[in-house]
């Protein structure tokens, strides 16, 4: 039998002889403890492993994680706009040259929802330096500024996007790589 909880924050782990015995969690009602024979760290950032004292690395073997991305969606995009990576790069390079701020990378993807004037933009990005509340807030603020810069760049320098509107910004940045568990050495 496997139980799982949504809307829960992992806040601690108790280990005995390198084995996790209990985890401490929080939800909107307060704190609670979970005991089990086995736990699976499905946090995506090795949070349970870190709290249990496991050996971890940050990013790749050189200590460099991949960029985190904040996606956003535009509506009102013309049907015939060139959304190729080369067209995106040309527009962003030109926008940077013309002084549009907060454009951190030139290469990215814009993906159209089938048979619509709605596109998903994967451009705003940042290299994570940690996962503390302070660092997460800094990254969220920075990438949200980037969204506005990319919106201006695409409206100005990509023909067919002049009348596009910001429909939605992703709820939070998405990570590809942060902490990883070190396996058997």
Predicted regions: what they are:
Residues 1-4:
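N-terminal Rossmann-like dinucleotide/flavin-binding domain of flavoprotein oxidoreductases
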Residues 6-21:
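A conserved short coil-to-beta-strand element within the FAD-binding core of flavoproteins
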Residues 6-10, 26-27, 31-38, 42-185:
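Flavin (FAD/FMN)-binding glycine-rich loop and adjacent Rossmann-like elements that form
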């Amino acid at each position: 039998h496997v139980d799982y909880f949504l809307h829960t924050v992992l806040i601690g782990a108790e280990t005995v002889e390198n084995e996790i015995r209990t985890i401490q969690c929080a939800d909107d009602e307060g704190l609670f403890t979970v005991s089990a024979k086995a736990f699976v760290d499905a946090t995506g950032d090795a949070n349970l492993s870190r709290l249990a004292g496991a050996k971890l690395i940050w990013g790749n073997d050189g200590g460099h994680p991949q960029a985190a991305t904040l996606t956003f969606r535009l509506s009102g995009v013309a049907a015939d706009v060139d959304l190729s990576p080369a067209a995106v790069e040309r527009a962003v390079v030109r926008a940077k040259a013309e002084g549009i701020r907060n454009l951190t990378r030139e290469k990215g993807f814009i993906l159209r929802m089938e048979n619509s004037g709605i596109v998903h933009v994967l451009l705003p990005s940042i290299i994570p330096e940690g996962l503390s509340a302070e660092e997460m807030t800094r990254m969220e603020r920075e990438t949200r500024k980037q969204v506005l810069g990319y919106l201006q760049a695409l409206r100005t320098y990509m023909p067919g996007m002049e009348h596009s509107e910001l429909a939605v910004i992703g709820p939070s940045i998405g990570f590809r790589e942060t902490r990883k568990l070190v396996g058997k050495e």
